[in-house]
């Protein structure tokens, strides 16, 4: 539980590009083992591969349908699948083995495979069946189908809570045990998850010091005015702390449903330095309303910390305007019509920020539109003077003549040569 690790920016960009461009634009599918560190209080959200929204994080359950003794929880977990474990009767997973003595046994098979590394390929196999039944599904369709077809295992487990959209979801199991039959049945008639919409709020820079060893939360609220039906949420935090394992970090949605991003655990490492947490707990909830990031230092010791900055990034399907269809709603897009001009500047320049055929003129390409530029053609003469002097203010080859250089153009000068 004392390792916080994530892929670098090139790897993240490669995963994202593959999700959007693989399979001729439908996107490649990534499944990822949630992790086997439960006995060390590890959490899948401390793994930047497993909490990436383009991957499907998979936890493990035993043959009783209960959390395997090693399977890490996390707000990023989408589904769970069977693997080894169980008490009082232990049962492993049977699979092929390395031939001969180098394997788990002298034979070519083993009945003791396990871990989330066993649960994850089971999910991959079900996804293959889903894609076989409907080859036109994109990467978001696959995730949506898993959310809506998985079954609620171990129903009496207290980790199950209903989110604001009516889904039962668990930090141990995600949306439940994968169900091949239900998933394929749903996939056969699946049409579309809708056009993706993304919106960010922040970064906010509170610079707030955290009280040490208290049971009360330090809260950072933000009101979201737009309506996106959520799929995933990313939370970027920059928190200075000399023992980050002391911190509880929770995101609360307008419905009151909570994503536990980090819980107190044995990790004396420093800081969450621009760390990206991921959560799927709010799937199908609306973004509209008050969101709260809650942080507390629950250990009384000499370690202290400060919340330097944080940011919320929403992904889903928006009931919002997106004029240029770039996936970012106009509310969050500095250039709504994608014409290369900032909306605020367009308004100042008396052009339409929602029409990419309506762009500010900038004759001299100085970055100031003609509407606001005193010298449209950049010839050194103010436009109003050029108009008075019968020269063209939009042509820098047309400049007022001033033979005697007295500052009055010949057109208006009663004595052009200044000879009295």
Task: Please report, for each region that a protein language model flagged, where it lies by residue.
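Mature extracellular/periplasmic domains of secretome proteins
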Residues: 1-32, 39-59, 64-84, 138, ...
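Extracellular calcium-associated, cysteine-rich motifs in secreted modular proteins
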Residues: 319-420
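Short beta-strand-plus-loop segments that form exposed binding edges in beta-rich domains
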Residues: 294-303
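Residue-level detector of buried hydrophobic side-chain packing
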Residues: 58, 79, 117, 126, ...
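Extracellular S/T/G-rich loop segment that most often corresponds to the catalytic His/Ser-adjacent loop
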Residues: 48-132, 136
């Amino acid at each position: 539980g004392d390792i916080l690790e994530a892929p670098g920016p090139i790897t993240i960009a490669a995963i994202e590009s593959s999700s959007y461009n693989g399979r001729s634009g439908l996107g490649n599918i990534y499944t990822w083992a949630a992790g086997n560190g439960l006995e060390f209080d590890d959490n899948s959200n401390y793994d930047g591969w497993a909490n990436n929204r383009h991957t499907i994080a998979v936890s493990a359950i035993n043959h009783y349908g209960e959390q395997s003794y090693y399977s890490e929880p996390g707000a990023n977990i989408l589904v769970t699948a069977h693997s080894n474990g169980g008490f009082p009767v232990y049962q492993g997973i049977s699979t092929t083995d390395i031939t001969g003595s180098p394997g788990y046994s002298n034979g070519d098979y083993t009945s003791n495979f396990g871990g989330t590394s066993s649960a994850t390929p089971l999910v991959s196999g079900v996804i293959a069946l889903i894609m076989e039944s409907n080859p036109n599904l994109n990467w978001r369709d696959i995730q949506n189908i898993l959310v809506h077809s998985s079954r609620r295992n171990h129903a009496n487990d207290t980790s199950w809570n209903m989110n604001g959209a009516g889904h039962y979801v668990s930090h141990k199991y995600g949306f439940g045990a994968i169900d091949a039959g239900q998933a394929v049945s749903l996939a056969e008639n699946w049409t579309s998850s809708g056009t993706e919409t993304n919106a960010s709020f922040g970064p906010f820079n509170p610079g707030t010091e955290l009280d040490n060893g208290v049971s009360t939360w330090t809260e950072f609220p933000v009101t979201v005015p737009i309506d996106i039906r959520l799929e995933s949420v990313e939370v970027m935090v920059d928190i200075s702390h000399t023992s980050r394992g002391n911190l509880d970090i929770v995101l609360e949605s307008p419905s009151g449903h909570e994503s536990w991003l980090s819980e107190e655990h044995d990790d004396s490492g420093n800081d969450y330095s621009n760390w990206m947490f991921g959560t799927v707990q709010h799937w199908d909830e609306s973004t509209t309303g008050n969101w709260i990031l809650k942080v507390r230092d629950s250990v009384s010791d000499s370690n202290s910390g400060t919340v330097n900055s944080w940011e919320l990034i929403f992904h889903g399907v928006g009931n919002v305007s997106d004029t240029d269809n770039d996936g970012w709603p106009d509310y969050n897009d500095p250039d709504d019509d994608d014409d290369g001009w900032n909306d605020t500047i367009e308004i100042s320049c008396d052009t339409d920020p929602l029409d990419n055929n309506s762009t500010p003129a900038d004759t001299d390409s100085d970055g100031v539109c003609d509407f606001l530029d005193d010298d449209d053609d950049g010839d050194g003469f103010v436009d109003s003077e050029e108009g008075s002097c019968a020269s063209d203010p939009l042509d820098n080859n047309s400049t007022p003549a001033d033979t005697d250089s007295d500052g009055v153009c010949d057109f208006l000068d009663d004595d052009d040569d200044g000879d009295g």
